[in-house]
Amino acid sequence: MRYSQYFIPTVKETPSDAEVISHKLMLRAGMIRKLAAGIYNYLPFGLRSIRKVEAIVREEMNRAGAIELLMPAVQPAELWKESGRWEFYGKELLRFNDRKDAEFCMGPTHEEVITDLIRKEVRSYRQLPINLYQIQGKFRDEIRPRFGLMRGREFIMKDAYSFDVNEAGADVSYEKMYKAYRRIFERCGLKFRAVEADTGTIGGNYSHEFMVLADSGEDAIVSCSACEYAANMEKAETRKGEGIEHADPRPMEHVSTPGQKSIEDVAAFLGVQNTQVVKTLVLVADGEPVVALIRGDYDLNEIKLKNHLGCAELEMAEDDVVVKVTGAPTGYAGPVGLAAKVKVVADLSLEGMHNFVTGANAADTHLKNVNIGRDFSVSGFVDIRNVVIGDACPRCDSGKLEIWRGIEVGHVFKLGTKYSKALKATFLDADGKEQTIFMGCYGIGVGRTVAACIEQNHDENGIIFPIPIAPFQCIISSLSVKEDEVKAASESIYQELLEAGIEVLLDDRDERPGFKFKDADLIGIPLRIVVGAKALAEGKVELKERRSGEVEVLPIAEAIAKVKAAVKEALQV
């Protein structure tokens, strides 16, 4: 491809609305352009990288025995109502009515559609197992689309669905996909980790996320210092801790705390540690208020609480709800003498804790020496907090938990019979008895994988693409396009590389060398051959590796051979 005939609209200045480095560089390198919030045009240069990831995904899916199909982006509401997700999925599901007033949605995922297909076509155990996948555009109406392709509303996704006769078969399918995902991300040149994860709106029994390690990652990843335990923050488990205060219960007393609302302020005012203060949080679960109690130095994990309650929607209560439940303004809520009868859930950190401080459900007032059981009751002690660095590992006795940042690029789910039961997807077994199909589903964010790669592979000059997903593998910077010798040599090298199957971009623009070098660094093509009059007079060219910055002046044939060898090595499967 000749640069002068290609479309790579690079820009020198960083766009003001771009926050993370991948968003900034994808805009500057002419890979994407914003159309609307969370919706992007994939420009030719960016699309080449997208297609590289898709090709790797297809090869590994096919190798694992999955079969490609394509399903509609528009889905009828009745399928989602049948599965129970029409209301559960929430506002991220973009719903609309057609001209006949029939309800539809733009598919953010395809569990209902694929299950409907299978229930109509599969009759016998002889037709199972089967694994079907597609690579297709999805739409999720994110409340805060941001970070470019990291959290868009419209995105490209590979989703696969496995169907088995029993749980043992489903486990085999899950393991095949797990291994295929590891191969995919290894081939893309990514540093990643597979971690236990919450199943979220997809549901099911068990899941793993594949997280690309990056300081800019939205997600927190938890791992053990001594064993293989790893999970995302939503899923990471805590152990029951020791009670902070073991003294016998003391008489509860009201104390005046004028203007003291935060945990830190209250603790300092009363001369106690944050660990001796209990937060009383009022939330609304499916329209009903609920109270969560947690130690003052910890943060509530809303996903854990939501899963415990089994609700579809969970959010912090507005001030008027807090007043209705507690009888006091926000900042002074406590579990003793609540104005309304609500469910009270306590974190494990409170089990065995005595003589702690809480709000008194009255303005400018707190309670000291509060004790569970004597002063109020809870529905149970549940793990509803975020882990912190140094927590004991829930799986081994010696390890401590560490926290990293990561970007989710893939997710595998063991669904069990969640969708097949709801949609009545069954088969006849060898004895002629009707059985429910066991399912799994497996997703990869294709555009997000490219963005995550850039987050992990860049420097101050621009992108550093790994060869397997680089839009081009080599760029030829022809420095003096008006000099016949330079032009001819550049053309000869270009043709030889093309004939060898190398994806090469010939920069034949009539621009200054520095301008071309800056563009080459920005767009991140892994290998660069520089053809200039001075070196060419000796039959040589300059070969530069983008990642290491290493520069060699070599005979033309040797430079070409090195490019071929580097590409061949990088693409070995």
From Swiss-Prot:
GO BP term, pick one: prolyl-tRNA aminoacylation
Free-text comment on this protein's domains from its UniProt entry: Consists of three domains: the N-terminal catalytic domain, the editing domain and the C-terminal anticodon-binding domain.
Lineage: Bacteria, Pseudomonadati, Thermodesulfobacteriota, Desulfuromonadia, Geobacterales
Principal location listed in the UniProt entry: cytoplasm
Name of the protein: Proline--tRNA ligase
Subunit: Homodimer.
Source organism superkingdom: Bacteria
GO cellular component, one term: cytosol
Family: Belongs to the class-II aminoacyl-tRNA synthetase family. ProS type 1 subfamily.
EC number: 6.1.1.15
Nucleus found in the keyword field: no
Keywords, alphabetical: Aminoacyl-tRNA synthetase, ATP-binding, Cytoplasm, Ligase, Nucleotide-binding, Protein biosynthesis
GO function term, MF aspect, one: proline-tRNA ligase activity
Gene designation: proS
Record Gene3D superfamilies: Anticodon-binding domain, Bira Bifunctional Protein, Domain 2, YbaK/aminoacyl-tRNA synthetase-associated domain
Signal peptide annotation: none
Species of the source: Geobacter sp. (strain M21)
Keyword Ligase included in the entry's annotation: yes
Catalytic activity annotation: tRNA(Pro) + L-proline + ATP = L-prolyl-tRNA(Pro) + AMP + diphosphate
Subcellular location(s) per record: Cytoplasm
Function: Catalyzes the attachment of proline to tRNA(Pro) in a two-step reaction: proline is first activated by ATP to form Pro-AMP and then transferred to the acceptor end of tRNA(Pro). As ProRS can inadvertently accommodate and process non-cognate amino acids such as alanine and cysteine, to avoid such errors it has two additional distinct editing activities against alanine. One activity is designated as 'pretransfer' editing and involves the tRNA(Pro)-independent hydrolysis of activated Ala-AMP.
